[in-house]
Amino acid sequence: MALFGENTVHAWAQINCVTGQDTIRDSYNVSSVTDIGTGRQQFNFSTNAINNDFAVACLSGNVSGSTTAPRTQNPDAEFNVAHFTIRNMNIDNNQSGTAVNDSLINVICCADT
């Protein structure tokens, strides 16, 4: 059964960015991931969104072992109908944060269809 309408999942992905090349483990409607720099990834849609008023949720950490410091993910650029960009930050000891690549980054994007 196809699901259409407002607030549906437009795209999702699970990626690995530790190796120096962002690798998509699995995804839906994500054609590629562009490594912009340490802790910065651009997720490119296979099919564009109808507008740039969509919501993105992210989480990151380690695939195996413990994630030793909290993480936060923030938009890194204005959303675009063709892609969105995030910045993955390591927040250790309540500092301002350091951009970090992680072995596990999950994103989900909900948008009008």
Question: What do these predicted regions represent?
Answer:
Residues 51-79:
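Terminal beta-strand-rich extracellular "head" domains
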Residues 56, 84-86, 107-109:
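Hydrophobic beta-strand residues in large extracellular and virion-surface proteins
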Residues 1-50, 90-113:
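Extracellular receptor-binding modules and their adjoining Ser/Thr/Gly/Asp/Asn-rich linkers
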